[in-house]
A protein has these predicted regions:
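Gram-negative bacterial Sec-dependent N-terminal signal peptides
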Residues: 1-21
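Outer-membrane beta-barrel architecture
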Residues: 9, 13, 65-67, 105-108, ...
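Outer membrane beta-barrel
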Residues: 22-36, 52-182, 190-192, 199-210, ...
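Residue-level detector of the transmembrane beta-barrel scaffold of outer-membrane proteins
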Residues: 25-27, 77-79, 115-117, 174-176, ...
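Sequence/structural signature of outer-membrane beta-barrel proteins
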Residues: 35-41, 87-91, 179-186, 191-192, ...
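Residues that define the transmembrane beta-barrel architecture of outer-membrane proteins
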Residues: 48-62, 99-102, 157-161, 190-194, ...
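Detector for outer-membrane/organellar transmembrane beta-barrel domains
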Residues: 197-327
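Outer-membrane beta-barrel "beta-signal"
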Residues: 336, 371-385
Length: 385
């Protein structure tokens, strides 16, 4: 159960007018596990070795946050969210060491018209397509992401300096749009971001689509105070475009889904999140494309026991080569209570046509393999509060 704290009980940290009804909710999730990987490299191009490691956030990133609302009357509220990501194994902050790296925003919300918020926020691809892919849910998460999280469905990056609109639900339809400012005088388009998305829900059916574009993220002309910073994004490129859509349909305790996304990068200079001591992988100022197809499903065997799985095929173009990625991912989870569960999940990834590239199979979150194949398995526990 989430713990709702009255603002007055926070000893002056949060103040409120006597006539307004206000609240602050403290919430969080801790995900800790042990992960085995059959092949990891310390340096790109180096020898691969099996690896056992203690992990944080193998499924869902560990986090704690504060969510607040003040009733302004007439269906209007002032709202805010401050959310910190952290590594439970060593206590450090995630998202480049930011205090509130996962989310930090404030705004106004109307039951009739929707919400407008400003701050560090998720984009429309994450908001609308993410919940339809297993990487965007509790049924797969980090390690189920598409190669290098190229479409950001696993929230590798957030958008700074952003203003965001999310509509109310109109007979099952929802719309959203976001713009992230570059904050640079004379360089309005230098490291800016914008996105738009929509969804429709009717009973067991859920359909969504979205588009996002980033300009000059991590490029030689990058504005480091702009919308997306290099330490959080998978790629450095002159322009990155992501679009796609998905569909889910529920049959009683079962849900099946399909997701399509495509990521295109112009003037791509490096791949940033492969977790090797050699640092970033040089992409040679090339055109890069990833086209992802995911088929997924989940089933509640009992109220406490669930199983889930996904197959992802990714057709890509990287530095003139045409590697293809196949990944099969499976998870089972058992709820010990409403807030605590244990899980076991595994992934197998096979990469083809990679002979002339300095990369191998790379299951998201576990690091690169020295070969075209990689297997990973994690046993873990999650606690929500």
């Amino acid at each position: 159960m989430k713990k709702t704290l009255m603002v007055a009980a926070l000893t002056g940290v949060f103040a409120t007018a006597a006539h307004a009804q206000s609240s602050v909710t403290l919430y969080g999730l801790i995900d800790a596990g042990i992960t085995y990987t059959n092949n990891n490299v310390a340096v790109a191009g180096g020898d691969g070795h099996s690896n056992w490691k203690a992990t944080s956030g193998s499924v869902n990133g560990s986090r704690w946050g504060l969510r607040g609302a003040e009733d302004l009357g007439g269906g209007l509220k002032a709202i805010f969210t401050l959310e910190n990501g952290f590594n439970i194994m060593n206590g450090t902050n995630g998202q480049g060491g930011r205090e509130f790296g996962r989310q930090a925003f404030v705004g106004l919300s109307s039951t009739q018209f929707g919400a407008v918020t400003l701050g560090r926020q998720y984009d429309s691809v994450v908001d609308f397509i993410g919940p339809l892919a297993l990487t965007g849910t509790q049924y797969g998460g980090t390690q189920f992401a598409h190669p290098f999280d190229n479409d950001n469905l696993d929230n590798t990056f957030r958008v700074n300096n952003s203003i965001k609109y999310t509509s109310a639900n109109y007979a099952g339809f929802k719309l959203g749009a976001m713009y992230g400012f570059s904050n640079e005088a004379g360089g309005f388009a230098d490291n800016r971001a914008y996105s738009i998305g929509a969804s429709y829900n009717y009973g067991p059916l859920n359909i969504a689509g979205a588009y996002m574009q980033l300009n000059n993220v991590g490029s030689p002309t990058n504005n480091v105070n702009g919308a997306v910073t290099t330490d959080n994004t998978p790629f450095s490129a002159g322009r990155q475009r992501i679009f796609g859509g998905g569909i889910n349909y529920a049959f009683g305790p079962a849900t099946v889904g399909f997701v399509f996304t495509q990521t295109m990068l112009d003037d791509a200079t490096s791949l940033n999140n492969v977790a090797t001591n050699a640092g970033n992988i040089n992409l040679g100022d090339s055109h890069v494309r990833f086209t992802n197809y995911e088929v997924n499903g989940r089933y509640n065997l009992t109220p406490a026991l669930s199983i889930a799985g996904a197959y992802t095929y990714t057709d890509s173009r990287i530095a003139g080569e045409k590697p293809k990625f196949h990944q099969v991912s499976l998870q089972t989870a058992y709820a010990l209570s409403k807030r605590t569960d244990v899980y076991l999940q595994g992934e197998y990834q096979h990469m083809t046509d990679d002979d002339n590239l300095p990369i191998g199979a790379t299951i998201n979150g576990v690091g690169m393999s020295s070969s075209s194949n990689q297997v990973s398995a994690t046993v873990g526990v999650r606690h929500r509060f």
